[in-house]
Structure formats: structure tokens, C-alpha cells
């Protein structure tokens, strides 16, 4: 109940802030052009703000400890491996971090190729062989080199804009329909209108999530291919095989799991940010 209340309160707060900002800027959201400007500003704005603070959020959320001076041979090997792969991929050395988790997982994040973070869990670092860890690191470095963070941010911005725009257009149509059948012609009223917008935001948001997940799965295949070039196909396959034998990933927040090595499994593959491990292994084997 608390989560639902917070979700509703957050949505209403965003709508209120959006309306105030648009009023200050003099944007008329009652016209299609004004509404599209409103949708684009908040659709892309939210996505790019998330990208800009992604490294900071990852460090705080996951409790990442950035390695500046290696404390042992394992950390030294980790830094040297990422440095070598980054050089091969033609990108600036990412920050390298470790976070405490029994799960075998890792992720890459950051606003650009030259300002990124690669983090691995203790479960992965100490639970896999060096060859397997090297395959995972190559996968994450490939995400950075491919510019996946920016690409998915642009896609997220587009679908956010669609959700905001479409929800309010449909709500406007419903309001006009109710108004035309109402003797007083008052329509839905402010609170009913906001409730309709909220529901439509949720429904269109589900569709948007499916679209983003589709592109995310494509980027995963590309990152696997990049890892095979950087570390060797056998190391990447070995890493995926090892992950397939382990438990399902569950602890990583969505904004990080999109660029993790091991995504959550779902009965509905359409909603998965990562292809099933079996399909990823098969794709590498047939390369």
C-alpha cells in the first residue's frame, strides 16, 4: 500500500511540477504543439538526468567501492584486465569497482564512453575462474564501447515522450467525449482527468517497457559479440555457462540490471532486458 501511495504521489507531483514549469515557460499544453514540447522536455529530460547521475546513483545504490590502489593480487588483476580491454576497445579507462553481493553479476554505467564505471560483485569476482571473469569484464567494456548507455537513454527518451504525449491526448479525447454528453459540458473535472492520465501513463508505460526491453536484448547480443572479440569466444561462453548454473539474478536495481551481465528471468520474454542465457550461448556458438 505504501509503495502504491508513493507511486501515485510521485506521479501527481511530476504532473504538478511539469504544469508549473510549462506555465513559467509560457508553453500552452492545450495545443498539440505545446503538448509535444511538454512531453519531449520531460520525456528526454528525465532520461538524460538519469544518465548524468548514473555513476553516482550506482555507487550509492549498490555500495560500490571504487578501486584506486589495489589491496591484493585479485584487485590488481581486475584493474589490469579492464585497462587492457579498454585500450583494445579504444575507450578511456573506466572506473573499476567492487560491490558486496553473493550474486554473480556485474554492470557498466556512466554518461559517456570516457566517463564510465565497471563494477563486479564479490560473488562473481571470487566465485568464477579468471577466464570467466575476463569474459564478463569484456562484456561490460563492450557495453561502454558500443555507447549502449547513451543509445538506451535516447530510446527511453523517445518512449517517455510517447507515453506522456499519448496519455494526455487520449485523456483529452475522453474528456471531450464526456463533456459532449454532459448537459453542463464540464467534462471529467480536474481530479478525474488526472486519474485518467495516471492510468493511461501506466498502460502506455507497459508498452514502452516492452519496446525498451527489445532494444536492450539486441544490445546484449552485441555486447556478447564484443566480449568474444576482446577476451575470446570460449571465455564468454564459459562465463554464460557458469551464470546459467547459478541462481537467478534479483538484487540489482533496474537501471543497473539493463547493463548487467545476468538479467532477471521472466515468463514473458518480451519484458526481459536480457535474452535467455541459452539463446546468448547459442548465438555465440554459431558465430
From Swiss-Prot:
It is a multi-pass membrane protein. It is found in: Cell inner membrane. Pfam families: Peptidase_M48. Its EC number is 3.4.24.-. Its cofactor is Zn(2+). GO terms for cellular component: plasma membrane. Its main location: membrane. InterPro entries: HtpX_protease, Pept_M48_protease_HtpX, Peptidase_M48. The active site is at residue 140. GO terms for biological process: proteolysis. The chain crosses the membrane at residues 4-24, 33-53, 154-174, 195-215. GO terms for molecular function: metalloendopeptidase activity; zinc ion binding. Keywords: Cell inner membrane, Cell membrane, Hydrolase, Membrane, Metal-binding, Metalloprotease, Protease, Transmembrane, Transmembrane helix, Zinc. Zn(2+) binds at residues 139, 143, 220. Binds 1 zinc ion per subunit. The keyword NAD does not apply. Gene3D superfamilies: Metalloproteases ('zincins'), catalytic domain. Belongs to the peptidase M48B family. NCBIfam families: PRK05457.1. HAMAP family: Pept_M48_protease_HtpX. This is Protease HtpX. It comes from Shewanella sp. (strain MR-4). The gene is htpX.
